[in-house]
Amino acid sequence: MQDAAPRLTFTLRDEERLMMKIGVFVPIGNNGWLISTHAPQYMPTFELNKAIVQKAEHYHFDFALSMIKLRGFGGKTEFWDHNLESFTLMAGLAAVTSRIQIYATAATLTLPPAIVARMAATIDSISGGRFGVNLVTGWQKPEYEQMGIWPGDDYFSRRYDYLTEYVQVLRDLWGTGKSDFKGDFFTMNDCRVSPQPSVPMKVICAGQSDAGMAFSAQYADFNFCFGKGVNTPTAFAPTAARMKQAAEQSGRDVGSYVLFMVIADETDDAARAKWEHYKAGADEEALSWLTEQSQKDTRSGTDTNVRQMADPTSAVNINMGTLVGSYASVARMLDEVASVPGAEGVLLTFDDFLSGIETFGERIQPLMQCRAHLPALTQEVA
């Protein structure tokens, strides 16, 4: 029998406030986000990600995001040793979708801002105005050392100064088609980009440190943050409150989008058994690599994304918030997420993406009050 879970009761005014956007964090790297020998083992391919994003679009997901990873963690699972490239993948996905928003990630140490501006304008054309850019500063030193472009460990403390100049160049080029920006890191001399995007280009970030949030408050359209714990859907609330306060100080409205993994089944016990199975197969060698990398940055404080990822509490899925339970239980927990001030959306991963998205669309989302505004489903995608 499916576990019963109490439904939250909201007034109409609350329901309007609690409409929440849903995105999928596509598996651009092998094995998704489970560092376990017991998890599904697969390589990233365009066909897999096309199927995932088309299915997400069918179930009225609002957006799809891909990360960028240039070197993996190794171990028995070769975790993230095999990765596609974000902009080219999302350009392809933009061409085979029609409604869902598409976001690629720029590893800003590897790509000059003028090139990113032009690539983004191109995918804007492909997608019909559905594209945006996620900017990351880079935290894993070996990704950049292997190419000879690591700027030195002082970069850890200056990376948001670098990103501030980077985004100013982007905004110049997208907004006016030219830039003469002069800074410590970038010098533009009548730099031109045309055509410009058809709509204002959205910029997103994932800052959890004070410096990261200050940057997002000033320049981002919204900010990603990690969920926290297992079946503690509102534990991220202090992070969202910090982001909300930082944005208010900048005179802007920058919502938080929260990262969660969904592990669902018919009953709470069945879902919990999956989760325990994945944890029992944790790839300790790959996890050791993650821990080692998290200790390289001694300049950014203790509140960075990578420090949370490496926390041994739930490193098997990089410590993103984890929702484990029956379909009704997961729906209830996601409605709780939507009730947190400043939380405007969630970015979801799944233990098995194709079946997970289908189960979410058919069995979980219909129970969510914060998604009650959605239209009826059309015929299933092929």
UniProtKB/Swiss-Prot annotation:
Entry keywords, A to Z: Flavoprotein, FMN, Monooxygenase, NADP, Oxidoreductase
Reaction it catalyzes: uracil + FMNH2 + NADH + O2 = (Z)-3-ureidoacrylate + FMN + NAD(+) + H2O + H(+); thymine + FMNH2 + NADH + O2 = (Z)-2-methylureidoacrylate + FMN + NAD(+) + H2O + H(+)
Induction record: Up-regulated by the nitrogen regulatory protein C (NtrC also called GlnG) and repressed by RutR.
GO biological process: alkanesulfonate catabolic process; nitrogen utilization; uracil catabolic process
EC top class, as a word: oxidoreductase
GO MF assignments: alkanesulfonate monooxygenase activity; uracil oxygenase activity
Record-linked InterPro entries: Luciferase-like_dom (IPR011251), Luciferase-like_sf (IPR036661), Pyrimidine_monooxygenase_RutA (IPR019914), SsuD_RutA_monooxygenase (IPR050172)
Superkingdom of the source species: Bacteria
Pfam families: Bac_luciferase (PF00296)
Family: Belongs to the NtaA/SnaA/DszA monooxygenase family. RutA subfamily.
Function: The FMN-N(5)-oxide reacts spontaneously with NADH to produce FMN. Requires the flavin reductase RutF to regenerate FMN in vivo.
Protein name, as recorded: Pyrimidine monooxygenase RutA
